Amino acid sequence: MRYFFSLLTSLFLIVPISSGDLASSLDQNLNGVMTKVTDWRHYFHEFPELSNREFKTQKSIAEALVEMGLEPNTTYGKTGVTAFIRGQNPGPLIALRADIDGLPVTEKLNLPFSSKERTVYQGNDVGIMHACGHDAHIATLLGVASFLSQNTDKLNGDILLIFQPAEEGAPEGEEGGAELMLKEGIFDAEKPDAIFGMHVSNAKHGQLWTRPGPMMASAEAFRITIEGKQTHGSRPWNGVDPIV
């Protein structure tokens, strides 16, 4: 998956790691890593969960990290997961973040790993789908974690993995997402020198898009109320036309 390589490429650029040694190790273990990433992506795509309800997703991520010899922390953001990869050489602390929630969208593709999950959302029976690529984000970060956890001797500094829930927005009346994780003190003990995330895109294989500052802003919904003032047609100046 090209996003796995994009995130690893970013690491080679931003962290003073022994990139040559890591690249050589990746070449030697490429097929095994890619098989894992593909399997994870299919699994999480088949079993998506909505914001603040990512219970099975959280459990599966934590179990995968344990198998890598890491110690997952599930105390932040209700259904979030964090874990450290400690390099054997001094260097910065870099955080890598992936979002994990799905959307109330019914999948229409008939694939072996298509989502068949359903729920009641705002009074309607709807499907649940990873329609925004978060399944690929989870799989990519797990792939990077799997690779780096086996190469800590070549890693200068530490990596903080952040699997963030509720990126699409917490349910009405609930807290969630990155804001809640920060409120709960995710960086109180150790503050990263930098944080990097990524999103699936239409970039060609081998390309990495980035820019300083905000990137890929989301579209938000809002509701407004316009109040008019009734008047007679012969005296429009006494009224307020809400349409105009």
Language-model region placement:
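Bacterial N-terminal signal peptides
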Residues: 6-16
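Histidine/acidic-residue-rich, glycine-tolerant segments that coordinate divalent metal ions
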Residues: 118-129, 135-136, 153-244
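Acidic/His- and Gly-rich active-site-bordering loop/insert found
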Residues: 22-130, 139-143, 147-160
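General alpha-helical segment detector with a strong preference for membrane-spanning helices
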Residues: 6, 103-105, 137-139, 203, ...
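Positively charged n-region of N-terminal signal peptides that target proteins for export
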Residues: 1-4
